[in-house]
Amino acid sequence: MKISTLEMIHETLKNEYEMARVSYANALKETAHCEGVLADAADEKAAVEAEKKLDASKKGRDEARAWATRAQDALHDFEAQEF
C-alpha cells in the first residue's frame, strides 16, 4: 500500500473520530437540557412530554458514545500498526 494511501486513511480516521467526539459532546448537552426541562415541568402533561424527550436524547447520547468509541478504537488500532 502506498504511503499516500495510508496517510489518507489516517486523516480520515482522525476526522471521523473528531466528528464523533463533537457529536457525543452535543448529545451530552442535549441530554442535560432535557433533564433541566423535566425538572422544571409545571404539570404532569409537561413532565410526560419532557420524559419522552429525555429518553430519546439518552438513546441518541448512547449511540453517539458508541460511535465515538468505535472511531477512537479504529484510530488507535490504525496508529498501532507498523507499516
What are these regions (language model features)?
Residues 1, 8, 23, 33, ...:
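N-terminal functional modules and adjacent low-complexity/disordered segments of proteins
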Residues 1-28:
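Short, charge/polar-rich alpha-helical segments
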Residues 1-5, 37-39, 80-83:
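A short, terminal or domain-edge coil/loop segment
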Residues 22-56:
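Short E/K-rich amphipathic alpha-helical oligomerization segments
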Residues 24, 53-83:
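Amphipathic alpha-helical coiled-coil segments
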